A protein has these predicted regions:
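Bacterial Sec-dependent N-terminal signal peptides
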Residues: 1-16
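Extracytoplasmic/secretory-pathway proteins
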Residues: 13-161
C-alpha cells in the first residue's frame, strides 16, 4: 500500500498543474491562485519540497502579474512567507530550500537590477523591505546565502531530487 502513495500523490500534483497550465492558456491567471495555494498546502502535508517550491514560484509569478502593489511591499510579504516555510523544513529539504531561496533573490535582482543599481547604499537598511535594498544589500545577502551552502556542499552533493 505504501508503494502506491507516492504514485497517487504525484498524480494529484500532475492533475493540479495541468489545471494551472490550462488556465494559463486561456488567460485565467487569477483562477490559478486557489489551485496553487491548495498545491502548497498538500505539499506541506506530504513534505514534498519540490512541489512546494514550484507552487511558491507560481504564486509569486501570479501575484506579480495580477495584483497592483500600491504599498510597494508585495515582494517583501512574499519573501516573509518564504522564510516562514523555511523555518518548518529540516535536513535535505532545508538545504534544497536554501538553494532555491538564493535563486529567488537572484532572480528578483536580475529582473529589477535597472532600478536597484540606482539606489544609494545605506548602513541602516531595512532588510525586511526587499523593495528598498541596494545592490550592496543583495550582494551581502547572496554572499551569506552562498557561504551557508558552501559549508554544506558535501551534503548537497548527496541529495537526490
Amino acid at each position: 500500500m505504501m508503494f502506491f502513495a507516492p504514485l497517487f500523490g504525484q498524480k494529484y500534483y500532475d492533475d493540479q498543474w495541468k489545471k494551472v497550465s490550462d488556465n494559463y492558456k486561456t488567460g485565467k491567471y487569477k483562477s490559478n491562485l486557489p489551485i496553487i495555494l491548495e498545491i502548497q498546502k498538500q505539499a506541506m502535508k506530504d513534505e514534498n519540497i519540490n512541489q512546494l517550491i514550484r507552487s511558491l514560484k507560481a504564486e509569486f509569478s501570479i501575484s506579480n502579474q495580477t495584483y497592483d502593489d500600491g504599498d510597494n511591499d508585495a515582494t517583501s510579504r512574499f519573501f516573509k512567507k518564504l522564510s516562514t516555510f523555511g523555518e518548518t523544513l529540516k535536513g535535505d529539504q532545508k538545504l534544497v530550500y536554501q538553494v532555491l531561496l538564493g535563486e529567488f533573490f537572484w532572480d528578483y535582482y536580475q529582473n529589477n537590477s535597472w532600478e536597484i543599481n540606482q539606489r544609494t547604499n545605506f548602513d541602516n537598511q531595512d532588510f525586511a523591505q526587499i523593495e528598498t535594498w541596494s545592490k550592496l544589500d543583495f550582494k551581502n545577502f547572496l554572499i551569506k546565502n552562498f557561504s551557508i551552502l558552501n559549508a554544506e556542499k558535501d551534503h548537497l552533493k548527496k541529495i537526490k531530487t
